[in-house]
Design a protein with these regions (language model features):
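A conserved mid-protein helix/loop that constitutes part of the nucleotide-sugar donor-binding site
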Residues: 75, 343-348, 520-543, 563
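Conserved donor NDP-sugar-binding/catalytic core segment of glycosyltransferases
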Residues: 159-190
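Acidic donor-binding segment of Leloir-type glycosyltransferases
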Residues: 85-123
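Boundary detector for helix-to-coil junctions that initiate low-complexity/charged tails
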Residues: 2-7, 18-44, 289-294, 706-952
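Nucleotide-activated donor-binding/catalytic signature segment of Leloir-type glycosyltransferases, i.e.
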Residues: 119, 380-387, 566-584
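Glycine-rich, basic loop-to-helix element that forms the pyrophosphate-binding segment
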Residues: 125-142
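Aromatic "clamp/platform" in nucleotide-sugar-dependent glycosyltransferases that forms part
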Residues: 604
Length: 952
């Protein structure tokens, strides 16, 4: 994993730049697709997006068997489950083997799986046997023609399995396929290695685990080595490569590998480094000879020869998705996803259709760098870059398959030549499906005026033809009058709520680009191609500079004329005037419009340029070529249109006649900008475009159901498609060869320039060297003359120096004597310094002792202060206790007095009782002695004492 490139910071989530784009194995027929601006955004999108691809019905004969081993899985399973169960390919079974889990919650989760989905089949191990054994057990029960290996904590793009299946179905020479991977969790990076680099596999595992393997080819070599507790997948891939099975890695990021530092395979390897090294060397030793005896080169899919049987190929399986959104299921064919007006229109349209409940599937037909892919992916993940998965001979089969799988209602073509040649087949086979195309402009330099020509030629197979301007609608009717009833005009419009001038960003961007406050910024947001006439733009700016006008040109764009344009700028010495930046995302482009004062677009041809819509919405005055339908948008009070000329001085002067007043008059710019925004807000808001397109979609659905399908000659249609494919392939190869030739020419040009520069430098250096030699010769002659004069002067001075020398000798002797005295004093001083040094050392040692004593004293004082505080606290406590004791003593004293009084009362009562007892005793004694009268007398005494009134 450490060898991966394209690292994205986990802390900052930095933007993935264009530098990450690579040429895929030297095969220009494929495109690398970057999913999102950073790893975290992509992963969050997979985890949070709600998808409706699931078909709950289990297949009796599944095409794919997903293989998973389950051991105490719990934490991340739900995320994995959702990305698997919501795949766009639903013809699968999911076999999960419980490798004797011990966690009760994990066991309960496992036992609930068959109830959650009819596609899941579960099996058990009685003992824990490891990941390899779990996979092997699952494979034994697999019924699919393909095996897909899935760990239960990773994530998948919704189209992952489907793209793998489509690839292997149309590339029988390959046994397995994977994709680029996104590493996330504890580490975030993009992994772009894979099976297209087989020679690298002996050094490291080039894939992160999720691959689709033909079951027949897998069974031929057997399962995973169950003796290996880790790296069992690496060992199995090496076995396949060593036995001449080949695989491919699709250059798209279709799976996410959870990189965990504290658990999992990586953690196990780190915790037991010696075992990891032993297993690694064991695996390498098994296949080192096979890799060394064979020279493995990078692999690339080969395009089959033109064969009508390939054209008639059809996928022999079904994949019906559970789609209920009838009437709103759209298959869109687009050529690319990059900076440009047509792609921005598609982005706006698809985004709003998705918000209105449409289900969109997008097919890309051109291999290039799709800079805006991730923005379309944010609208719908159901995107297929056809060159990455299929040969063009199989694109017709793909279209048939998708229409059936997604139950497509509408097929929408936007600037895709290839899709037009599929129309005769699709219109004939799917009469209930509506077919619409959308065209932005004519193109005089492409295929004979471009898309309008092919649209008009195949108009009978289109239910409706939508154009971006009335100008283009009129042009269609000239090409083919029969298109009149099918034509609809829908302008691309602009989101006026989003596209507003941002004054804070204006200053920020101008400061960043070094544009002074008084400079007028002129914006050129376009690809550097002949259509946009970048050289004419440079000429116009140069003339403005010649007139001493303070202007700065901002160019947003790039393409194959970039180097030539830069060379022209350098030749005119205008580097300080131009700010050239690469194409930006739509949200970022707004900032540059806000920073600009004028939009200048001297195009060769246009429909209605999207840049003009955007500039008018941001209140930037427009100066553009009067071509196409641009007069339908730009009126005299809202901008300036200049008649297209020959790109000569006269046309430059025509632009200057408009630009100079705008540059010099701020009030004019402000007035035109406000009027422009008012016009687009009133007549061209984006909502109007979406409403219009939805109205057309509804109308065309009804037309398709009522119209009679046109007659199709299958042989002629087939021949036309083959002709186009041959021409398309020839053009692709020529373009590739032209690029190589152009690259070679550029290299030769660089070498020629280097040689010329070297020759000029050498000539200049030789001339300078001769001049320097002549200068040095003249200096030498002058120096010799000076030496001669100096010799004469020295001879005349010799005698006087001799006398002076004698005097100096006497002075030296006196100096020596004085020096001896100084030496004596110096020795005394040295001894004194040594004494001072000893004293200093003694004082330093004493200082350290005093410092220690002071520190001890400070600590003792601290202790004394603490003890004093404790004593004070104790005294306060004793005083409070004494007060309590005094109160208690007073209380007990009172109680004691009460007790004493009570005691005296009790003693008195006791005395009384004793007297009573004595009287009773006397009575009893008298009665016993029959002394009745004594007893009676005693009785009466007792009665009187007691106060009794008792009769005898």
């Amino acid at each position: 994993l450490e060898i991966a490139i394209g690292v994205v910071s986990a802390q900052t989530g930095d933007r993935i730049t264009d530098s990450l784009a690579i040429e895929v194995s030297g095969d220009s027929t494929m495109s690398e697709l970057i999913p999102y601006p950073n790893v975290r955004a992509f992963v969050n999108g997979l985890q949070s997006r709600e998808l409706d691809f699931e078909n709950p019905v289990a297949s009796a004969e599944p095409v794919v068997s997903i293989i998973s081993s389950f051991y105490n899985v719990r934490d991340y399973f739900e995320q994995t489950y959702q990305t698997v169960i919501c795949q766009t390919f639903q013809n699968f079974e999911w076999i999960i083997v419980n490798d004797c889990s011990t966690d009760p919650e994990a066991i309960a989760l496992f036992e609930s799986l068959p109830e959650r989905s009819a596609k899941i089949r579960t099996f058990h191990h009685d003992t824990n046997r490891g990941l390899a054994a779990g996979r092997n057990t699952a494979i034994q029960h697999a019924r699919g023609r393909y095996l897909f290996f899935m760990d239960l904590d990773d994530l998948l793009d919704p189209t992952c399995i489907e793209k793998f299946v489509l690839f292997l179905e149309t590339h029988p020479e390959f046994s397995f396929v994977s994709s680029y991977s996104v590493l996330f969790h504890d580490r975030e990076l993009l992994w772009i290695h894979g099976f297209h680099e087989p020679a690298e596999f002996l050094d490291r595992n080039g894939v992160t685990g999720r691959i689709l393997y033909r079951k027949a080819d897998f069974d031929e070599l057997g399962g995973f080595d169950e003796d290996l507790r880790f790296y069992e997948d690496w060992e199995r891939w090496l076995k396949a490569i060593a036995n001449n099975q080949i695989g491919w890695t699709i250059p798209e990021f279709l799976d996410c590998y959870r990189h965990k530092n504290k658990s999992g395979l990586l953690a196990s390897a780190k915790q037991n480094v010696e075992e990891e090294q032993r297993v690694s060397e064991l695996i390498r030793s098994r296949y080192r000879d096979a890799f060394e005896t064979r020279k493995l080169s990078e692999i690339a899919p080969t395009r089959p020869d033109f064969d009508v049987r390939e054209l008639r190929f059809q996928f022999d399986f079904e994949n019906p998705l559970d789609r209920t959104n009838e009437g709103k299921r759209v298959l869109c064919f687009v050529p690319q996803m990059k900076v440009g007006g047509s792609d921005k229109f598609n982005l706006d349209l698809f985004g709003h259709l998705q918000q209105r409940g449409y289900d969109l599937t997008i097919a890309i037909t051109i291999s290039t760098q799709h800079d805006w892919y991730w923005q379309f992916h944010d609208i719908t993940p159901d995107i297929f870059c056809l060159p990455n998965c299929l040969h063009d001979l199989h694109w017709l089969a793909f279209a048939r398959y998708i229409i059936k799988s997604r139950q497509i209602d509408i097929v929408f073509l936007s600037n895709s030549y290839f899709a037009y040649y599929l129309l005769p087949f699709l219109q004939h086979e799917f009469p209930d499906v509506a077919f619409i195309d959308y065209t932005h402009t004519d193109d005089p330099g492409s295929y004979g005026i471009g898309y309008p020509r092919v649209s008009c030629q195949l108009a009978q197979f289109l239910d409706t033809q939508v154009v971006a301007s009335q100008y283009l609608a009129n042009y269609y009717q000239q090409l083919n009058p029969e298109t009149q009833d099918k034509l609809r005009v829908c302008r691309i419009n602009v989101d006026t709520q989003k596209w507003q001038r941002d004054f804070d960003k204006r200053q920020e961007i101008r400061d960043r680009l070094g544009i002074s406050p008084d400079a007028i910024a002129i914006l050129f947001p376009a690809r550097i191609v002949p259509q946009k006439r970048p050289f004419l733009f440079v000429d116009i700016i140069a003339k403005l500079v010649e007139r001493n006008l303070s202007v700065v040109a901002i160019i947003l764009g790039s393409d194959y004329l970039y180097d030539d344009m830069q060379a022209k700028i350098d030749k005119l010495d205008l580097q300080s005037v131009f700010r050239i930046l690469p194409s930006a995302a739509p949200d970022e482009v707004i900032e540059f419009y806000s920073a600009s004062d004028i939009l200048l677009l001297p195009s060769e041809y246009e429909g209605i340029s999207l840049a003009i819509y955007e500039a008018m919405s941001v209140q930037v005055p427009v100066v553009a070529a009067d071509v196409g339908g641009q007069a339908e948008l730009v009126t005299p009070e809202t901008g300036f249109l200049v008649p297209k000329g020959q790109g000569d001085a006269a046309e430059v002067e025509a632009y200057l006649n408009v630009l100079v007043p705008l540059v010099e008059d701020a009030n004019l710019r402000d007035r035109v900008g406000k009027a422009a925004r008012e016009r687009v807000v009133r007549h061209f808001p984006l909502e109007n475009m979406v409403d219009r397109m939805e109205e057309i979609f509804t109308e065309v659905r009804q037309l398709a159901q009522n119209n009679t399908p046109p007659d199709v000659n299958p042989v002629l249609a087939e021949e036309s498609l083959i002709w186009f494919l041959e021409y398309f392939e020839f053009e692709r190869r020529m373009a590739s060869q032209w690029q190589k030739t152009q690259s070679w020419v550029n290299e030769l040009q660089k070498h020629r320039d280097w040689l010329e520069q070297k020759y000029r430098q050498e000539g200049e250096q030789s001339r300078q060297w001769i001049q320097e030699l002549q200068t040095q010769l003249e200096r030498s002659r002058q120096w010799i003359e000076q030496l001669e004069a100096s010799r004469n002067w020295f001879e005349s001075q010799y005698q006087s120096w001799k006398e002076t020398a004698q005097q100096r000798q006497e002075e030296i002797e006196r100096s020596q004597q004085w020096n001896q005295e100084l030496q004596t004093q110096l020795e005394q001083s040295r001894q004194w310094v040594e004494q001072l040094e000893a004293s200093r050392n003694w004082f330093e040692s004493q200082y350290q002792n005093w410092k220690q004593i002071a520190e001890q004293t400070r600590q003792e004082l601290e202790q004394a202060r603490d003890w004093s505080e404790q004593l004070q606290a104790g005294r306060d406590w004793f005083e409070s206790q004494l007060h309590e004791w005094q109160n208690s003593a007073r209380y007990h004293q009172g109680e004691l007095e009460k007790t004493r009084a009570e005691l005296e009362r009790v003693q008195a009562m006791a005395k009384t009782e004793r007297d009573r007892a004595e009287q009773l005793e006397a009575i009893i004694t008298a009665m016993e002695s029959s002394k009745f009268w004594q007893a009676r007398s005693a009785w009466f005494k007792l009665k009187q004492r007691l106060g009794l009134e008792v009769e005898d």
